[in-house]
Swiss-Prot record:
Protein name (record): Acetyl-coenzyme A carboxylase carboxyl transferase subunit beta
GO cellular component labels: acetate CoA-transferase complex
Reaction(s) catalysed (UniProt annotation): N(6)-carboxybiotinyl-L-lysyl-[protein] + acetyl-CoA = N(6)-biotinyl-L-lysyl-[protein] + malonyl-CoA
Cofactors that this protein relies on: Zn(2+)
Residues annotated for Zn(2+) binding in this entry: C29, C32, C48, C51
GO biological process: fatty acid biosynthetic process; malonyl-CoA biosynthetic process
EC numbers on record: 2.1.3.15
SUPFAM superfamilies per record: ClpP/crotonase
Family: Belongs to the AccD/PCCB family.
Job description of the protein: Component of the acetyl coenzyme A carboxylase (ACC) complex. Biotin carboxylase (BC) catalyzes the carboxylation of biotin on its carrier protein (BCCP) and then the CO(2) group is transferred by the transcarboxylase to acetyl-CoA to form malonyl-CoA.
Keywords of the record: ATP-binding, Cytoplasm, Fatty acid biosynthesis, Fatty acid metabolism, Lipid biosynthesis, Lipid metabolism, Metal-binding, Nucleotide-binding, Transferase, Zinc, Zinc-finger
Amino acid sequence: MSWLEKILPKSKITTPRRHNIPEGVWTKCSACEQVLYRAELERNLEVCPKCDHHMRISARARLESFLDEQGRTEVGAELEPQDILKFKDSKRYKDRLSAAQKATGEKDALVVMKGTLKGVPVVACSFEFSFIGGSMSSVVGARFVRAVEECIKEGRGLVCFSASGGARMQEALFSLMQMAKTSAALDRLTKAGLPYISVLTDPTMGGVSASLAMLGDINVGEPKALIGFAGPRVIEQTVREKLPEGFQRSEFLLEKGAIDLIIDRREMRNRLASLLAKMLNTHVIEE
């Protein structure tokens, strides 16, 4: 025992009581690393309130925040993916589908809803990137075509939020065929005189960017979204040159004329409602 311990009274050292904080209450911005309250981030549509970084948002959450609450219905929910080729790589395709369905709660990588946008009749589609990288499968193509058919039948505008790595390799040519299938459907929509607004979010790559994502009457990008066919590293290795800073980001594409607008996710609802109202010769209902 030290001389200090002899002259000082013994005191019981107490530590603050640990509070059990439920998992998932806090998260961190992937750009600025600011610690954020999860509920506040969700209210801000997964956009960091400090640096305005647009994080990825689930397809269903995006559509529910985008469309009017009243009267929206899901389209093509009964369509389910099939392992036609009995494909197997390091894992069976059937097992990959089951794991993705369990993780996301979705049957496939595209969710389609019919409803109104501030009173303007629309059909809206959104890719679920967490479902096998938002890859385009036969079901994704079929649901997109169903969305187009609903627009033509009822005179609605079409909006699609893309977030995809491209065609689904496990479905081979069945997946690649969806590029032509969705493009042909959009041609019918154009001939019907109905508008299509394509919103490219982070990331939109491969076969999706080479088909339905770039065929909008108006192509919109979210801020700093990665948009292209092949990834920047693949291009650098192919051309053996250093790419410009910000290459394949939405700001770069806007500067080069590849997209028409960049819209903050929090302004998307108002801006697209205004555009669609003009294109459909109707008016928005102010909230």
